[in-house]
Amino acid sequence: MVYITEIQVNVPLETFIKKMDRVENKRHWQKGLVASEHISGDIGQLGAKMKLIYKFGSRKMTIVETITKRNLPHELHANYTTKTMHNIQQNYFERTTNGFTKWTSKNKFLPLNLVMRVMLYLSPSLFKKQSLTYMRDFKNFAENGISLANA
């Protein structure tokens, strides 16, 4: 499944990238993120791997992030892998005519087991909705300084 989401964030591109490119900021806009662990490579750089640990109620989820392209301030691509799903994400950032930032995210989800294949088939909108939630939460963090770290 492939889809594209877009959002305008009302901060200059430089401010957007400074907030987006800091590992410690992820907890402010990725609800449920409880820990991150460097695995390999230079943090945030091409080829770097990081373990992201999320907790949703009593459910724990571990995702491995691998940076696949870094061309800031315009592009940041990464793969996100769990035991059941592989997500190829391509993020594009551009300065708008009014001096803000347009964030376009292209996602491709590849299920790694039958259960996820069925879930992706039956509820594809859940994945797009979650992507949009993260984008809106980043927008709120970047524009208003509102953190989800303790939410």
Label each PLM-derived region with a short phrase.
Residues 81-133, 149-151:
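Beta-strand/loop substructures that line and gate deep hydrophobic ligand-binding cavities in soluble
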Residues 11, 56-58, 69, 109-113:
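Beta-strand elements of well-folded, non-transmembrane domains
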Residues 5-7, 38, 52, 63-69, ...:
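Hydrophobic/aromatic beta-strand elements that line small-molecule binding cavities or substrate pockets
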Residues 13-14, 41-45, 68-74, 92-104:
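A short, structured loop/turn motif at beta-sheet edges
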Residues 1-40, 45, 133-134, 140, ...:
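Hydrophobic ligand-binding cavity/cleft-lining segments
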Residues 37-84, 133-151:
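Glycine-rich portal/gate segments that line the openings of hydrophobic small-molecule binding cavities
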